[in-house]
Amino acid sequence: MSPDIVWGTDIEVEEVRGIPFKVYPDRPRHIGDLLGYAARWADRAHIVQGTQVVSFTDLQRAVEAKARELADGGLGADDRVLILGWNSPEWIINFWACALIGAVPVLGNGWWSDSEVADAVETASVTVALADVRGSAKLPKVLPTARWACDVQDADEQVPAFVAGERASEDSPAVIVFTSGTSGRPKAVVLAHRSLLAGLQMLLHITRRLPHMVDENTGGAGLHTGPMFHIGGVQTLLRSIIVGDTLVMPVGSFKPDEALRLIEEWKVARWSAVPTMVSRVLEHPDAQTRDLTTLKSVTVGGAPIHAEFVDLLRKGLPGVEPRVATGYGLTENGGQGTAASGRDTVERPGSCGRPLPCVEVRFEGATDDVDGEVLLRSPTQMLYYYGEETSPITEDGWLHTGDLGRMDEDGYVYITGRAKDMIIRGGENIAPAAVEAALAKYPGVVESAVFGVPHPDLGEEVMAAVVVSDGSTADQLTEHMREHVSSFAVPTRWQVETSPLPTNHAGKIDKGAVAEAARARLMEESQ
């Protein structure tokens, strides 16, 4: 039996923490309540990884058993519990168990070093840790730990259901998610129940997947290749239990050949990933021999998608063309800002769509010729950075994103770069994203990273690290760029190769690492 929660589609303005937000009056209030939807899907497979297949019933029993175990160990409301591990059924069960007892899951990055784990434990004032084998080896010895393992298959049918205590308010902390740290030390973003549930409700609303809009035939297999410890992973967990999705997860880190095998074997219908992952799958030799016809929907985020990427999808996955989707968001706003799908991704390449129903967007400092900083205001935004006094949110509720962008006359948003990444060459501002978009138009370019490097007279010059598939040269790329960008934005330094660029734990190109290595090499060459 599903929880007695009313999900509405009407929107009104409500004062939240002294700020006027657009909200759904009829809404869920606590993420722990969502676990009850597992009963609707019963014996359907919910989590698939390797040889493990966990049904929705298995999940609910295992979560309640784990919640009882944690509560018996003294954990409860407001305790901050570090979950440190790679994607697995145990990760998901531990997350839901923390939510059920009112604890606050602190999502650790499975790729962190020992010192980064120690920093996170200190930053978020972690009470206890739940860690897999790899994660356990990185934990500070003084930190208390609880058992990672979960009794998935052995959960006893006769054990009474776990009875949760009084629910915290919707504006109390629900989860702590760390930023990627690409601009420095990762920040601990505290998201409320309202933050997560408002984002979930908006997505279910626009896709017509609210609980009362779906039937028992809804759902299907979805490939999940991103880390659960990012905001996108949390969104996937919440959505999948509402619509009855089967989460198909690779074992370990992302591998194109394994992704292809899983799509064929589990007849995957949906896949959410960053563009780099999708490109590498479609360019893998096995893509020509695997049956990918069941894949009907691809959602990409983490980087703009251009016409060339959509064309790659058309050729490699012709069945997904009407259902290519993208969007824009960041951890600090619960990952939910804008969305685009279908024809919009074809007719407006480079756009991340229009604002979601409860999201307001404005562009600070924008003029007719200059893009402005993107500011967002919505109920999805964070409460604060844990352990930090500064906040990117103004008194009237506007979140400074640090991204640059603009909106066209039809309300579609375009993200053109990061303010901090702007290359300033002889007084001219150059957005790396715009240069990368132009490079993507060249047929032989597989992927690229554009950044600034020091120049004695101009301050900076433009450098491009480019992966090509057809033996293209720097001279050919330069000629192409002269036709597509201003003369001052044409890269004057090139790194052309055939091996993939390094990626971070989210599967995105690690531009920081590429730029750092290039600058060090240039410095060495100049000596």
Identify the function of each model-found stretch:
Residues 160-178, 184-185, 211-221:
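Conserved pre-ATP/AMP-binding loop-to-beta segment of ANL
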Residues 27, 49-52, 67-112, 429:
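Conserved AMP-binding/adenylate-forming
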Residues 343, 354-358, 366-396, 428-430, ...:
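Conserved ATP/PPi-binding loop(s) of AMP-dependent carboxylate-activating enzymes
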Residues 112, 129, 271, 363, ...:
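AMP-binding/adenylate-forming catalytic core of the ANL superfamily
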Residues 55-57, 174-202:
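Conserved AMP-binding A3 loop
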Residues 268-272, 286-347, 360:
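Gly/Ser/Thr-rich phosphate-binding loop
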